[in-house]
């Protein structure tokens, strides 16, 4: 279906030597298609210096300084999240090739690379659009990318004591959490950190976010689901006078005087899904629902 040369931007993690076979397969497939290939510098260095792969005919880019028709993430969901942060608001669809472990986002297996690339050229795929959380501060600005595809976590640090988090929704007081932290999750991130803290699984495409406490002091505290159009404001109190904020695992320390505003970002991330991919099949497979582990 594609009548012009397509450009593919490739991201990957740098701690899985086994992915060298997968990247070689991907590059060979794209070469046959005469695609233009650009590789993030850190990943390129890992492949050429660390793995000593002979990679030719590609260009190199740094972090978010690129443009492309498609982005390919080689790794697990963590690599996909990093790629998504680099894509930002560019609206470039992302394909996740799983060389990691769980792989909700990176759900293309290495042995499926060739036919998946063929499907891209033939237009035989769908694109999911996923909501993103944007974080704003009223004091010290965040040092890195201020949006999260999975979740935003506010956590205690350097102390066994809990933190206190005052939360409002659209200006209305919600509650005061006394806990080790609080996780605001998108539907995409609902099967990640939020789930491990008892949060709900939310089907992608559902226009909601959730708040889930991390080890709350009160058993009456329960997760809450609200419209993605809501604005959440958080004020933190801590005995150490600071706290940790983590956006898709990218963390930094903030003084407790810094108040946070969390809302839906003005763009969505485009996630490539192969034709015929069913969310509930993936969910059932990854969560091993119905699997008999008795041996």
Model segments located where?
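Short gly/pro/ser/thr-enriched loop/turn and capping motifs at secondary-structure boundaries
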Residues: 46, 100-105, 201-202, 218-219
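ATP/nucleoside-binding phosphotransfer catalytic cores, i.e., glycine-rich phosphate-binding loops
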Residues: 154, 170-173, 219-295
């Amino acid at each position: 279906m594609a009548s012009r040369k397509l450009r593919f931007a490739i991201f990957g993690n740098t701690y899985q030597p086994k992915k060298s076979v997968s990247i070689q397969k991907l590059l060979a497939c794209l070469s046959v298609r005469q695609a233009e290939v650009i590789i993030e510098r850190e990943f390129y260095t890992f492949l050429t210096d660390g793995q000593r792969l002979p990679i030719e005919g590609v260009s190199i880019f740094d972090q978010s300084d690129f443009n492309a028709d498609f982005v390919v993430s080689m790794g697990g969901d963590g690599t996909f999240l990093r790629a998504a942060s680099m894509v930002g608001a560019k609206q470039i669809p992302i394909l996740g090739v799983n060389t990691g472990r769980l792989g909700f986002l990176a759900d293309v297996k290495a042995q499926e690379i060739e036919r998946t690339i063929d499907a891209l050229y033939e237009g035989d795929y769908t694109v999911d659009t996923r909501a993103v959380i944007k974080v704003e501060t009223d004091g010290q600005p965040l040092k890195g990318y201020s949006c999260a595809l999975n979740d935003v976590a506010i956590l205690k640090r350097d102390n066994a004591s809990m933190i206190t988090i005052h939360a409002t929704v659209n200006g209305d007081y919600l509650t005061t959490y006394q806990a080790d932290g609080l996780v605001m999750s998108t539907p995409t991130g609902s099967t990640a950190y939020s789930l491990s803290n008892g949060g709900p699984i939310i089907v992608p495409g559902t226009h909601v976010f959730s708040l889930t406490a991390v080890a709350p002091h009160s058993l009456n505290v329960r997760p809450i689901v609200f419209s993605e159009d809501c604005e959440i404001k958080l004020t933190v109190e801590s005995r150490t006078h600071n706290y940790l904020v983590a956006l898709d695992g990218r963390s930094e320390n903030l003084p407790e005087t810094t108040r946070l505003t969390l809302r839906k970002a003005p763009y969505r991330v485009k996630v490539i899904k192969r034709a015929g991919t069913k969310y509930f099949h993936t969910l059932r497979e990854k969560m091993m629902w119905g699997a008999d582990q008795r041996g």
